[in-house]
Amino acid sequence: MVDTTKNTKLFTSYGVKTSKAITTEVAAKLISKAKRPLFVVGTGVLDPELLDRAVKIAKAKNIPIAATGSSMPGFVDKDVNAKYINLHQLGFYLTDPDWPGLDGNGNYDTIILLGHKKYYINQVLSAVKNFSDVKSISIDRNYIQNATMSFGNLSKADHIAALDEVIDLL
């Protein structure tokens, strides 16, 4: 079993709310219990190992995918519900409780994050964390401090193993 709670280095000042380190079991349970999840993927998901696992996660619970950056081509012909959206715009929309969502059925209660640059996604999640009730679960390689919950900093091999554990638990 991969310890996904290790190496959560906090580079923040006193009083700042940061994400909780989570295990693969907790991540899978939260994803399974989400009423309106959205899988937000970045360009890093084009790595073949990550892309394969992203597709498996989306298919396991029929989770729609918000493909950001240049990640959309990876989901063509993969039989998943993927739509392109700009990451910054998505962050703005998620803070609006009246946003109809990518499918017109309302805003999301939980976002799952994979394949993003740490410095970029942290800025977007700062707004989501402070101005909405949307929970964010980062299953990325790096600890994302502005997510609600996040894996710790993992090696590539540990990250792939952790994603496989999440898939098995979904």
Curated annotation (Swiss-Prot):
Fetch the SUPFAM superfamilies from UniProt. DHS-like NAD/FAD-binding domain (SSF52467)
A GO term, aspect molecular function:
anaerobic carbon-monoxide dehydrogenase activity
Q: Which domain of life is it from?
A: Archaea
Q: Secretion signal: which residues? A: none
Q: Pathway, according to UniProt?
A: One-carbon metabolism; methanogenesis from acetate
Key words, A-Z: Methanogenesis
Checking Pfam families in the record gives:
CO_dh
The Gene Ontology biological process terms listed for this entry are:
methanogenesis, from acetate
Q: How does it assemble?
A: Heterotetramer of two alpha and two epsilon subunits. The ACDS complex is made up of alpha, epsilon, beta, gamma and delta subunits with a probable stoichiometry of (alpha(2)epsilon(2))(4)-beta(8)-(gamma(1)delta(1))(8).
- Functional summary from the UniProt entry: Part of a complex that catalyzes the reversible cleavage of acetyl-CoA, allowing growth on acetate as sole source of carbon and energy. The alpha-epsilon subcomponent functions as a carbon monoxide dehydrogenase. The precise role of the epsilon subunit is unclear; it may have a stabilizing role within the alpha(2)epsilon(2) component and/or be involved in electron transfer to FAD during a potential FAD-mediated CO oxidation.
Mind telling me which NCBIfam families this protein's record contains?
A: cdhB
User: Which HAMAP family does the entry mention?
Assistant: CdhB
The entry's family comment says:
Belongs to the CdhB family.
- For this entry, the protein name equals Acetyl-CoA decarbonylase/synthase complex subunit epsilon 2
Question: What does UniProt list as this organism's lineage?
Answer: Archaea, Methanobacteriati, Methanobacteriota, Stenosarchaea group, Methanomicrobia
